Amino acid sequence: MAARAAMLLGAERVVVIDRLPERLAMTATHVGAETLDYSSTDVGAELRELTGGRGPDVCIEAVGQESHTTGPAYLYDQVKQQLRLENDRPIAIREAIMACRKGGSVFSLGVFAGLVDKFPLGALMNKGLTLRGAQQHGQRYVPMLLERIARGEITTSHLATHVMSLDDGPHGYDLFKNKQDGCVRAVFQP
């Protein structure tokens, strides 16, 4: 949804980064954004290539404490969490700061619960980045969003990949948690 919002607000180019094939395909099909699979590419190098060496003007981190990666950074964060030295895995926000162009903006929309380690404050300062974080308090946007949905500018039906009864709730949560059967969102009906 952040990618679609960026496009509606006039972003010239939108690149979505993920590792799950079903989400990458959904993004390409329903949003029209370019996609990168971080498990098979050097995201920073790829973003520099796509932007003529500068990096993106704006980076949106939308996964928060649930971010994943491969390699030592992920292992480091997992160990710190097990030792209760940090609460979250700030991999995506770190990468957003490192990828963003000088003078750019980084927005953190993902949920974080507490402390993080290895936050690249030096890069944030030296690049002169603007960092904003927000939990969505969007009641004031509901009328505008409903108008855009009515005009067909925003569609959401593709997000509900698994519709099931409330009785199947535990199964739906398992599908979502374990990323099984292409589950992006389980929606429960009474």
Residues of each region from the PLM?
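C-terminal hydrophobic helical "lid"/dimerization subdomain
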Residues: G53-R54, R94, G138-P190
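A glycine-rich helix->loop->beta "capping" turn
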Residues: L50-V58
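Short conserved loop adjoining the S-adenosyl-L-methionine
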Residues: V43-E49, T69
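Mid-domain Rossmann-like dinucleotide-binding core that forms the NAD(H)/NADP(H) cofactor-binding site
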Residues: M1-T41, A45, I60
